[in-house]
């Protein structure tokens, strides 16, 4: 089950991110600044993250060492196509760390479809996250076979976020986009270089995956190295080219 979090009573400051809606920067009592999202389920945390309250609103501290999306934001990514009201397909949801923050961002007017193949991870996702968040649907499916779960996804999605340790990450993402993504929709892919080719230089792997997306009809906006938060990882952000 979800954990009951402990709020801090120490005064701090929370301010909206200057670029991205429903993402915040929290200044903690020791002066450090951390990313945060407004908690959709007040009083509950997901992975032991700290809960803080500012002006009557509860926020969840977002650990960039446990979330590649948070790492990309701290590294200065210019496009985060996940916002209030967005419908998101999340491939490789694992136990729900980052999906829970995506759930906070899209809010009750948005929705997150979470595809995960590992049974233990999907169990944690169901019991600790989806059970308390009505805007999340967990799907025990193989992201390489989008046709198997198409019946569970209503309409087209605004954004596909992909974090799967597969050798053909960009192809997998593009295959899902062909089925589920809206025209001119966006994708974000957290590329793990060693899952694709351990013999290649990571930067070469990132270029290869970006080129695959281009060949599949995407305009690649950014390729962002995620070190020091994640070694040999990059975030690629792309938009489907208008037909």
What are these regions (language model features)?
Residues 1-59:
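N-terminal auxiliary segments of SAM/dcSAM-dependent transferases
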Residues 2-8, 121-124, 132, 174-242:
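C-terminal substrate-binding/active-site "lid" region of AdoMet-derived donor-dependent transferases
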Residues 18-21, 42-49, 63-87:
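Conserved alpha-helix/loop element of class I SAM-dependent methyltransferases that forms part
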Residues 73, 92, 160, 238:
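Residue-level signature of catalytic and energy-coupling elements of molecular machines
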Residues 83, 106-107, 180-184:
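Helix-to-beta-strand junctions that scaffold the AdoMet/dcAdoMet cofactor pocket
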Residues 83-94, 111-113:
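Conserved class I S-adenosyl-L-methionine
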Residues 94-108:
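Conserved SAM-binding loop of SAM-dependent methyltransferases across substrates and taxa
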Residues 113-169:
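S-adenosyl-L-methionine
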